[in-house]
Amino acid sequence: MKSESVLLPRKYNSREPSFGKAISFICLLWSLFQLWLASDFPFYLSEITKLNLVFNSQEARQIHLAFGLGLGLLAYPAINKINPILDKFSQFFLAALAVSACIYLYIYKLDISNRAGLPTSIDVFFSITGMICIGIAVYRSLGLPLLIVASLFIFYVMFGHLDFFPESMKWKGASLNKASWHFWMQTEGVFGVALGVSTSMIFLFVLFGALLEKSGAGNYFIKLSFATLGHLRGGPAKAAVVASGLSGIYSGSSIANVVTTGTFTIPLMKKTGFSSEKAGAIEVASSTNGQLTPPVMGAAAFLISEFTDVSYFDLIKYAALPALASYIALFYIVHLEVIKLGLKGLKRNTPARSFLNKFTSFIFGFTALGSIGFIINFLFSWTNNFSSTFTFMLAISLFLILYLFCIWIASKKPDLEIGLTDEEINNLPSVKSVAVTGYHYLLPIVVLLWCVLISRLSPSLSAYWASLSIIFVLLTQNPLKAFFRYKKLTFDPFKQGALDLIEGLQKGARSMITISIATGIAGVIIGTVSLTGAHQFIGEFVETVSSGSLVLMLVLVAFMSLILGMGLPTTANYIVVSSLMAPVIVMVGAQNGLIVPLVAVHLFVFYFGILADDTPPVGLAAFAAAAISKGDPIKTGIQGFSYDIRTAILPFMFIFNTDILLFNIGFISGLLTIITVVLAMLAFCSAIQNHMIVKNKIYETILLVVISFSLFRPDFWLDKIQEPFDKIQGNQIFELIKDNNNILNLNENNTVRVEFVGPDFDNPDKLVSQNSIIIFDKNEPVNKRIEKAGLFLNVNNNDIVMDEPFPGTALFQEMKTFDFYADKPVILKTIYISKNDRLPKEIFFIPSILVFILIYLNQHIRRNKHNRTQNEKK
């Protein structure tokens, strides 16, 4: 997220106290409302009071946007000042109109549903009012670019029939009544899927992050990272990478990460020898990668899950390896920069531990935690068989026991000061002395991960329980520490906990103002696509420009994401590009004989939307880092993007090799993939940095690029030496179809690639060829599989002639390329079946790894030779 993450609205601090308190109070109400929505209390209270205290999904969206628009128009003043009194009046007036337009839908929901599609004058009035208000809110809080994009889509809906539109873009256009109803009065527009995800999921995760930050966890992670890594060469830079990664677990904002961790890490990086631009760039690269880190991954992660119909658990699994590899690679890049600059680390006052000691401690800790987790999971599974209530009480009891134990340990040490003190910089504290002060901060994160990954609860319910756990920590940590330190119990620790909780709730809601507005206006874009089919002609245009090349199309989509990301928030950018391009990429992939999972395409768009945060000339994260480092923001952005090139290649690789996403692979294959992907990233980083142990020779850089590519795409080389498919043509297809008992040998994905040839829809005299991927049921005869796929075939001489697929079948959309009613028929020319007797693609890992080792040894010899020469000179 970009401007979605702004914690304090522009000009917020210039308000008079009473106005600021009013906004803070509304923010508090919003957070409490969202917690109310996620809890079971409305159901219990409704049963007791006989009142309807439960809000359905549509009602929740309406109230959610009412809060977001109202706060957005109050907290973000007009950019061009006219008169203070008039400006204030306009803010209150616009906020009241926006809230009224949302609440109108809630109050008159039954009347509106009864006249579906037939709006009254008052319906149209409130629809237009709501659209104008959300447009003003977008302009004030998110800037002009997103407003322009949304306005263009609305203009196309209203005036798509005009002559200045190309023939391929024209559509019949919508009347004012139809457009207003579509965008405001139903769930196809503003109150659509995007706003629904914001209401049910995004808010709770943002709130959890705000509460965790307020509890002191952010400061704890920064100090722990410095205590662990600060003594290494270039320690502050390496600590920045780890701290941003830890912050990314609960924060989905690159700018928030830069502002939070960069305030401490950037000055220290400069102090150890990094230039202002490089210090800022390292923080930017670390923070943008924080948005890729599961489980939060920014607001777009939940939208990806919703749009692709992939469970949130699976999405986390798919995103885990790319995020891990990206962070390891960034850590390695920082290490290479440190070597080239000859930097040292910070001093520490504890003796160094041997590698064997560290490794033994790690294995022991990992085994102990794994064993405890296994025992707890087994215990919960066993008790859940006869009483889910008992399991719930047992879980709470375990949480309380662990929490009290962690607080007791933390109470033995003084509380951590905010930021790094001069004493800590001059003499780094031991890891243990810092770690024990904040074990209790890890418990809410464990609750979140346990609920999502082990218990498989919904994202919203997982975030709800995690939020409750951190609320409990906020309220009790100070009183309990005072109790364990044998201090006299006063009201002050309780008061401080309550104030921290209130501020955390307010901070979470403030962070959501722009997210709610962005997801609301994004509904206009999605609504336009659903109403007009705009994605079809845009997809056809991009497909024409790319000449049907999947690689070129991916490059164009990447540039589109980067360019739009310069002006749009990550969430809106992702929605725009994925809505228009995701189906086209999947289709073009099929035509090129490649099965591209929809979730991989959405992650591709998501990655490049995030990378726009440090892409000059606009990258907002780069500007935030430059403000702290006092460096040049453009140079910071360029340097940051050069570090992020390693992240930019990952989406291209996992489109062609979905193993990188751990997509449908076993444990052993997954383990091998993790090792090779990390090694590939290290090789690529050595190539782009032109350094491994010493400076690369030209041939070494070239070899490292080839090694990286081979580890990412071993199938590329295999396809060059062995045909990937068996081809079945003409009479062979006829024989297969005629034999009802024939079971075709399919590949492990139960898919085949089919080539069609027929008259072009736009020019029937021209024959065109198209490839499609069809998923078959492996256990059925060929003829049954073909019918289920929507292939209606007839035999004409030696040709297999295809009739037009029925609407709703898998091939209906893809086959629009052909004219089925021309003089020449559409024929099924070839079926391609993956060969099962090919060499394993993993065989190409062996030479790649061997060459990598040889390069390493060669550079090691060169370094030793250089060191001996230097010693002889001395």
Segments (PLM) and residue ranges:
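Hydrophobic transmembrane alpha-helices
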Residues: 208-211, 246-247, 288-293, 518, ...
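Long, contiguous bundles of hydrophobic transmembrane helices that form the permeation core
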Residues: 2-18, 27, 317-510, 623-712, ...
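Hydrophobic transmembrane alpha-helices that form the pore/transport pathway of multi-pass ion
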Residues: 222-290, 296-303, 309, 570-609, ...
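Membrane-interfacial loop-to-helix junctions in multi-pass transporters
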Residues: 121-125, 188-201, 228-240, 272-278, ...
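Low-complexity, proline/glycine-enriched hydrophobic segments characteristic of transmembrane helices
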Residues: 48, 369-388, 591-594, 716-851
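Conserved, well-structured core domains of diverse proteins
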Residues: 1-114, 124-128, 329, 708-712
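Hydrophobic mid-bilayer segments of alpha-helices in multi-pass membrane transport proteins
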Residues: 23-28, 60-75, 90-99, 125-133, ...
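Core transmembrane alpha-helical segments of multi-pass membrane transporters/permeases
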Residues: 136, 140-141, 151-153, 160-166, ...
